[in-house]
Amino acid sequence: VVGDKIYLFCQGGKNFQTNSLRVPSAVLRISGSNIQSGKPVDIDSDYYVDLNDKTGDRYLWRCYYLGDNKFCLQLFTNPGMDGYTEGTHKTFGIFDVETQNYTPVTGMPEAGDINDIALAYASDTDKGTVTFELMTTSGAVLYTINRNGVATPGTKVEAEVIKGASLLKQK
């Protein structure tokens, strides 16, 4: 939910019942008269974004809200259905739901240098960042991605493995 609008991020993929139907990752919106008594009743007919068109045909794995209408997208590493077949999701980008602009994230290690990305993450909408733990070929490192699409390496963790990062805030 961004303001009075609800955005739906759909992973898309392949219809596994058939070999022919391919559904793109997409963003849909619910707003205005399509929200009645605080409940969504319909999807806006004037808002549809084919994320595969924006991301070089990469499918969506997960998304994280960064504030200021921007989401960090975690995408399958390889484009097209090869991404599903191969299965890793080591590509990131920033998507602005208002402008519908997509910006690839810079500053991340090459996909071949990333062994794993932890599922747990730390999101800070006040600062517009999301932090992930990456197990790279040189060890565990926390990477922070900002809403401008820049990833910055942070703390290197001296451990065999780390399963994620969290953010605690005092209210």
Summary of predicted features, one role per range:
Residues 51-113:
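C-terminal structural cap/anchor segments
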Residues 2-6, 31-34, 65-70, 118-130, ...:
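Short, solvent-exposed coil/turn segments at beta-strand boundaries
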Residues 1-71, 75-77:
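Acidic, serine/threonine- and glycine-rich low-complexity intrinsically disordered segments
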Residues 37-52, 101-110, 152-159:
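Beta-propeller fold detector
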Residues 134-171:
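Hydrophobic, glycine-enriched assembly/anchoring segments
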Residues 1, 51-66, 112-122, 158-171:
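Repeated scaffold domains used in trafficking and secretory/extracellular systems
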Residues 15-25, 82-89, 135-139:
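Short, solvent-exposed loop/turn segments at conserved positions within beta-propeller repeat blades
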Residues 22-35, 87-99, 144-147:
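Beta-propeller blade signature
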